[in-house]
Amino acid sequence: MAAPATSVLSRQVRSFSTSVVRPFSKLVRPPVQVYGIEGRYATALYSAASKQKRLDQVEKELLRVGQLLKDPKVSLAVLNPYIKRSIKVKSLKDITTKEKFSPLTANLMNLLAENGRLGNTQGVISAFSTIMSVHRGEVPCTVTTAFPLDEAVLSELKTVLNSFLSKGQILNLEVKTDPSIMGGMIVRIGEKYVDMSAKSKIQKLSKAMRDLL
């Protein structure tokens, strides 16, 4: 059953890609590959928006779409599975017209509605945001500590993390607190992961002790 579903998805994405990229002969590959249904739509949208030099505009519009879908009235009108697809398409057309969205964003939302993929909208927005983050040279970094960091330590941490970046890259840092790690920190930067938490050290010590017994 997976193959037919994949085939249908491929046709849907090609339809979207053709509808928005028709004036151009070549597709623009995104700087990072995103996967799944959402990734395919986001990739096609990135290619089209890049060709038309509307990446920033489309990104802002998609964020606005995300906000609109959090509105209970809008969500009920377009995400309710019991509402006819044709009604959802009409509702979305009214919304995109009212918001004065570009044809790129309007076409995306229309196609998602026609193909019964509106439930994937937030995923498409997230995938597009990931592509745009890499497009801008941003390197995602998450640091988890047991307790909040003071300004001096945070400043020193940023200096150390920035030293690992290449020229033109921008650190996109998110600091979280999780008392369960007990102390130390866990750092995830790009595709690298370093666990320096006290919890991890205790677990390793415990394992080493068991191995000796």
Swiss-Prot record:
Coiled coil stretches, renumbered: none
Domain of life of the source: Eukaryota
A Pfam family the protein falls into: OSCP
Subcellular location: Mitochondrion; Mitochondrion inner membrane
GO terms (BP aspect): cellular response to cAMP; cellular response to cytokine stimulus; proton motive force-driven mitochondrial ATP synthesis
Modified residues annotated as N6-succinyllysine in this record: 90, 100, 158, 199
Posttranslational modification: In response to mitochondrial stress, the precursor protein is ubiquitinated by the SIFI complex in the cytoplasm before mitochondrial import, leading to its degradation. Within the SIFI complex, UBR4 initiates ubiquitin chain that are further elongated or branched by KCMF1.
Record-listed N6-acetyllysine modification sites: 60, 70, 73, 100, 158, 176, 192
Tissues expressing this chain: Expressed by the principal cells of the epididymis. Detected in flagella of epididymal sperm (at protein level).
GO-annotated cellular components: cell surface; mitochondrial inner membrane; mitochondrion; plasma membrane; proton-transporting ATP synthase complex
Primary location class: mitochondrion
Gene3D superfamilies for the chain: N-terminal domain of the delta subunit of the F1F0-ATP synthase (1.10.520.20)
Family the entry assigns: Belongs to the ATPase delta chain family.
PANTHER family xref list: ATP SYNTHASE DELTA CHAIN
Record's protein name: ATP synthase peripheral stalk subunit OSCP, mitochondrial
Native source species: Rattus norvegicus (Rat)
Encoding gene per record: Atp5po
